[in-house]
């Protein structure tokens, strides 16, 4: 499932196959170009930059910053307004994720749960149309899981598409509109929560019955929207 995300977002090169995002073929496209198109992701193992502050991590998430270009770097007047807008967006997102009081702390000092929140907030700096979340709830305590679920639901209400990988069927069934279940490297079911919950192959995969599909050992999981 992570390999699937890596291919979609340009972190791995495909051997074969084609796919499109918003009408544009993106297979093999560089990851930063895919992000600029509006498809962003988080990682199963968070990628926060520990020696930078939470705020600086957020600022790095904004695309197409004029001040990063050599031709503009010495002309601050050309990008000062954009810089202020980017910082304002970062402040708003940190407040939304209840992290504004941590803005100047080093990312390395954050707990695992706080890093998950930071990674999701940083991804939203790109104002994406589609966000891919790789096991966002894994290892989280109940309070963190509920917080993350609330953010996912808010994104959906705002018109942002969310595709996430998750193993917890209760979480998947409770929040998803459409589910794709993978086992042993292949799709075994696809449909609405009501449809998937009645699928015998899904029941076998998660309960470890005798259809030849092992119980969930990390090779079984679901991509949900």
Each model region followed by its residue ranges:
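Helix-to-loop junction immediately C-terminal to a conserved catalytic motif
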Residues: 9
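Conserved ABC ATPase "signature" region
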Residues: 70-102, 132, 150-153
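A short, surface-exposed alpha-helical micro-motif characterized by mixed small hydrophobic
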Residues: 172-174
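Conserved catalytic motifs of ABC-family nucleotide-binding domains
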Residues: 127
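Conserved ABC transporter NBD signature motif
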Residues: 17-24, 36-37
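Conserved ABC ATPase signature
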Residues: 106-110
